[in-house]
From Swiss-Prot:
Keywords recorded for this protein, A-Z: Disulfide bond, Ion channel impairing toxin, Nematocyst, Potassium channel impairing toxin, Secreted, Toxin, Voltage-gated potassium channel impairing toxin
Consequence of changing R9A: 12-fold decrease in potency of inhibition of Kv1.1/KCNA1 and 21-fold decrease in potency of inhibition of Kv1.6/KCNA6
Family stated for the protein in its record: Belongs to the sea anemone type 6 potassium channel toxin family.
Residues marked Important residue for binding to potassium channels (site): R1, K7, R9, R11, K13
The protein, known as: Potassium channel toxin AbeTx1
Predominant localisation class: secreted
Record comment regarding domains: Has the structural arrangement of two alpha-helices stabilized by disulfide bonds (CSalpha/alpha 2(S-S)).
Functional summary from the UniProt entry: Potassium channel inhibitor that is the most potent on Kv1.1/KCNA1 (IC(50)=671.95 nM), Kv1.2/KCNA2 (IC(50)=167.36 nM), and Kv1.6/KCNA6 (IC(50)=115.68 nM), and less potent on Kv1.3/KCNA3 (20% inhibition at 3 uM) and on shaker IR (15% inhibition at 3 uM). It inhibits potassium currents, not only by blocking the potassium current of Kv1.2/KCNA2, but by altering the energetics of activation of Kv1.1/KCNA1 and Kv1.6/KCNA6.
Additional record remark: Negative results: does not show effect on rNav1.2/SCN2A, rNav1.4/SCN4A and B.germanica Nav1 (BgNav1), rKv1.4/KCNA4, rKv1.5/KCNA4, rKv2.1/KCNB1, hKv3.1/KCNC1, rKv4.2/KCND2, rKv4.3/KCND2, and hKv11.1/ERG1/HERG (3 uM toxin tested).
Annotated positions for site Key residue important for binding to potassium channels: K3
Consequence the record notes for mutating K13A: 7-fold decrease in potency of inhibition of Kv1.1/KCNA1 and 9-fold decrease in potency of inhibition of Kv1.6/KCNA6
Disulfide bonds: C2-C16, C5-C10
Localization per record: Secreted; Nematocyst
Length: 17
């Protein structure tokens, strides 16, 4: 996955693609 989610927050990962 390219996104990391925790406690209702989702962020795109810096090293993706």
């Amino acid at each position: 996955r390219c996104k990391t989610c925790s406690k209702g927050r989702c962020r795109p990962k810096p090293n993706c693609g």
